[in-house]
Amino acid sequence: MSNFARPGTLVAAFALVVSPAAADFSRNIMITGYWPQTNNMMRRFSANPAQNPDGWIGQNWEGRGYNIYAFFPEFPGQNGPNWGRGEGDFEVDYQDTSADWWRITSEVDPVAIMTYSRGNNDMSWEVESRNRNRTNWTPDYDAPFTPDSPPDPTFTPNGYRDSSLPMQDIVDSVRAAGLGLNAYIDRSAAAGGTFLSEYIGYHGLWYQSIHSDPNDEAWCVAAGHVHVGIRVDVETATRAMEISLRELIERVDATVPNPGTAGLLMIGGLVAGRRRRL
């Protein structure tokens, strides 16, 4: 369902125009959504023309040196608040989400990840401080109704992994924007819940832990999850997501070498010219 160039192509081009020290990680940031408006708010960052006919805006976004790629399901013929499973990338299904996760991350090699899902029936921007390697889950829509429990066999059952997003910076900037959102960090024991929000959120933290070494060619600096309130309209959600992305990029910039504009434009050109349907 996704459109993306093989990251090996990107890295090869990258190495032609920047120093070897800066060639060991991608300049790609991955964002994911589920139920509306978390899919619609990131639509312009999809490189799939079927989902984003107006064109991908993620290449060297705002001249900040990073390509932003969004992946999310669609819900044709459905109306909320119960949107169902959906179709496409990251359907609201445990097995589909996990399979898509490992496939897409192997192609994107994200240097940072933000996963999003629908939250409470309010105007909240809820930054999750952690996600849990749960041993019990709320059933999804189709058999098998639950995932492997726990999903991560390398980590303590029911153990927590911590977000590596710049959580307080995100909250402060969203509040300062005057969007009418209640932005806060959720530090509760419940973490991201017992459904797909927690599941994909945990996958993000799990992936980042695997690729946390700066010597890893798929080095991932930061990952975390945000719940978006049901009452948040798509325009407001989009603005808050972009604010969150800017804060994430500042965190990544403080950690990784700067490739320079020439390197990023080379990457973006190859992405645009060599996308393939998967």
Regions found by a protein language model. Give the residues of each.
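N-terminal catalytic or cofactor-binding beta/alpha core of small enzyme domains
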Residues: 24-191, 209-218, 253
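Sec/Tat signal peptide C-region and signal peptidase I cleavage site
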Residues: 19-23
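Bacterial N-terminal signal peptides
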Residues: 9-17
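Bacterial N-terminal signal peptides that target proteins for export
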Residues: 1-10
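Short, charged juxtamembrane terminal tails flanking transmembrane helices
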Residues: 276-278
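A short, hydrophobic C-terminal helix/tail in secreted or cell-surface proteins
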Residues: 257-274
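Active-site-adjacent mobile loop/cap segments within catalytic or ligand-binding domains
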Residues: 192-253
